[in-house]
UniProtKB/Swiss-Prot annotation:
Family: Belongs to the Cdh family.
GO cellular component terms given for this protein: plasma membrane
Source species: Escherichia coli (strain ATCC 8739 / DSM 1576 / NBRC 3972 / NCIMB 8545 / WDCM 00012 / Crooks)
Keyword flag Hydrolase: yes
Cystines in this chain: none
Gene Ontology MF annotations: CDP-diacylglycerol diphosphatase activity
Residues annotated as transmembrane: 4-24
Organism taxonomic ancestry: Bacteria, Pseudomonadati, Pseudomonadota, Gammaproteobacteria, Enterobacterales
Entry superkingdom: Bacteria
Enzyme Commission designation: 3.6.1.26
Catalytic activity: a CDP-1,2-diacyl-sn-glycerol + H2O = a 1,2-diacyl-sn-glycero-3-phosphate + CMP + 2 H(+)
Entry's localization field: Cell inner membrane
UniProt protein name: CDP-diacylglycerol pyrophosphatase
NCBIfam families cross-referenced by the UniProt entry: cdh, PRK05471.1-5, PRK05471.1-6
Amino acid sequence: MKKAGLLFLVMIVIAVVAAGIGYWKLTGEESDTLRKIVLEECLPNQQQNQNPSPCAEVKPNAGYVVLKDLNGPLQYLLMPTYRINGTESPLLTDPSTPNFFWLAWQARDFMSKKYGQPVPDRAVSLAINSRTGRTQNHFHIHISCIRPDVREQLDNNLANISSRWLPLPGGLRGHEYLARRVTESELVQRSPFIMLAEEVPEAREHMGSYGLAMVRQSDNSFVLLATQRNLLTLNRASAEEIQDHQCEILR
């Protein structure tokens, strides 16, 4: 019993330390790198010179930019042209806020252009990390390849994913996930952030603790994936864990 209690105490200490490290990362100057690129470089260059550089695309009227990430050959980031920190922002559950997940899905074409040939939709994934699972304090959705093992697991669970948020059998990457099937028409009309906040009990009050991902299924529907921070299981809710920025799935 004493050993079990000691082990539990050690796990708590590790979890607290991990959370502290995550917080320390977010309070450093480097955590504003993406925001500075968007607000001080991409946006002014587009407005003054009609040149989105260093971004790949700047859409001021639509409220977003697309930037090639340095990590991986095909990874891009979709970010707002104004200040939104991350999943904890109440702006994301405001219907007047742009539907960033839908916009990010449209931006997957940048992967194909970079690759030199079409990247199949089944190979693409979108992900945003929770407040403790990210290293940057500017909202950004990762547009990148999906891990082959995650792709296989989602294919195998196609029949088990419904239009309600339910636990995904077996979870993903050792962490628990909720999964919800959505049609393209649903996705166009409603942001996944609003779906999560309105449909999962108590999610609205804890949006910053969630990471969210989206993948297309073989029946042309989409699956939304949500994981919530759980420091006791060392889950920082970094939904980016389902992605493979080296794109092995294309080889």
